[in-house]
Amino acid sequence: MSTPHISAEKGDFAKTVLMPGDPLRAKFIADTFLKDVRQVTGVRGMLGFTGTYEGRPISVMGSGMGMPSIGIYSYELFKFFDVDNIIRIGSAGSYTEKAKLFDTVLATGAVSESNYARVQSGFEGDITQPSQSLNDKLRASAAKQGIPLIEGNIHSSDVFYRQPSDAKPTYWEKLRDERGCLCVEMESFALFANAQVLGKNAACLLTISDSFVSPEITTAEQRQKSFTDMMKVALGAEY
């Protein structure tokens, strides 16, 4: 049964879905790492693929940018396509010298000023949690492959372009600092909220693509094709 946003049938998706923001990164992962790949959806250019990795079925699908977008796609995957696990694999901007360009971050919580969870389910908190069992599997995969992980809270922002404010610190800066956020992205708070509401599992691996404490940045092509450590960690976990 297809949904308004996913043109697939039940059984087209594996129980575990890797979810980058960029649909072209989803295609790159499918083409580079998976065998017996088939495209299962492409509504609005949001590509999704199912194949196998080391003999295990796995799917990969783009989420788009921001919480409303990943909120729709992840909810439909969990609710209507019997997906049990979604691992976001995305890029992030570092808030600290501890997380340098191309480092891999494993989120232990997603902090946000967003009202996504309050509007959706009445949840009033400012932090949503990943699945601890999924995080344990990702840690084991990283250790097996010798890929270091930096762990901690991340900031899920609703806004990419913020206007200057006379208030110092601003609400989001205070929230970021109080929660000790390592980096900023725009999706995981909603993904974790969906998983909690629906009794499913979600996790988030991020590659540092730019920094608020360093002038270094990555190119669009690097973000699409070069963030392979987090891909290998997510693919290598035993779900």
Question: For the regions a protein language model found, what residue spans apply to each?
Answer:
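Active-site rim beta-loop-alpha module in soluble metabolic enzymes
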Residues: I127-G180
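Short acidic/glycine-rich loop or secondary-structure boundary segments that cap or lie
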Residues: Y95-E97, E113-N115, D158-S165, V213
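Generic non-transmembrane alpha-helical segments
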Residues: K137-Q145, N194, V233-A237
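His/Asp/Glu-rich mid-to-C-terminal helical/loop segments that flank catalytic regions of hydrolases
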Residues: F212-Y239
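Metabolite-binding pocket within alpha/beta catalytic cores that recognizes anionic/polar moieties
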Residues: M1-K137, K144
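A C-terminal functional module that forms or caps the active site or interfaces directly
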Residues: D166, T170-A203, S209
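Expand to "…catalyze enediolate/carbanion chemistry for C-C bond making/breaking, isomerization
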Residues: K79, P164-D166, I217-T218
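Glycine-rich beta-alpha junction loops
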Residues: P23, G93, H155-Y161, A190, ...
